[in-house]
Amino acid sequence: NLTGHDNIVTSVTKAENNDISTEEAISNVDPQDLMEVLFSTADETETEPLAIGIAASPGAATGKLCLSVDAVLETVDAGEEAIMFAMETGPEDEPGMRWSSGIATAHGGLASHAAIYSRGLGLPAVCGIAELNVTESSIDIGGVTINEGSEISINGTTGEVHAGKIHISEAETPSELTTLLDWCDQARHNLIGV
């Protein structure tokens, strides 16, 4: 069972060696392989998630729980990662969102402000966490209270929220991905006659 990275490298190498066609190389790569090489991923964890919301923007992040724009900015200024939690976000939250490593909200879905803004920035996000209640100084989630400044983790690919730190593997994008995407562009142009 190949990782996404290995599958992309193997498929491109086989096509470059004329063992398979470029079309077969494209077909061999699953969309999940692309997610794996473009976004950070959470390694398997022994702990159960506190809650599962909507996987609104892929990737995973661990950092200090922040409940306001000011808290995010202070955390980042101190050289630490910030995860912004809110009942929902709006334009007034964008300075904090921009500096966060990840975003989580109680309300909203794939078309919510938090989801769209996070995807635009390439940040992981979990939205629509039904069990989440945000107060001025803490969150209540899945029957657990977590104070602002505590470690928390989100997985925007699965929608999971974990207390504490989880191990995250940074995206490892192979150089062969550029070749594969060029072949995809060529195949697309051939199909639509542009």
Predicted regions and their residues:
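Cysteine-dependent phosphatase catalytic core of the protein tyrosine phosphatase
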Residues: 1-74
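Acidic, glycine-rich flexible loop/linker segments
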Residues: 2, 41, 48, 59-72, ...
